[in-house]
Amino acid sequence: IHLKPSTVVLLAGINDIAENTGPSTIEMIANNIISMAELAKANQIKVIICSVLPANNFPWRKGIKPAEKVRKLNLILQLYSYKNKLAYVDYYSAMVNDSHGLKKELGEDGIHPNKKGYLIMEPILEKAINN
């Protein structure tokens, strides 16, 4: 905020779903993202909220099944964005496979996008930034 950006892009939540820093509920994760958006809005910064990318497993956290949590978090973020007239960038729909994970060709580990994945994401985000 102190750098006074004109726009902030919020793409967050997957590491929290993976419980990388300990257990978190979907509501806790959503509230953290919403708090960031509210701080930006209060400082006249344009907010763009991005969907969490699809994931149906974590190679480093075998016991966690994230697909339903990702969908639930994305729904909360989409509804918040709509109600608050914020841009919502839907990467999920463009990148999901039939088993609710990241399309194999778009990432190496099923979580993080590769170059092909970023090439899918780029025009979607550019459209939101330019609107």
Question: What are the language-model segments listed below?
Answer:
Residues I1-N131:
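Alpha-helical cap/lid subdomain in secreted, periplasmic
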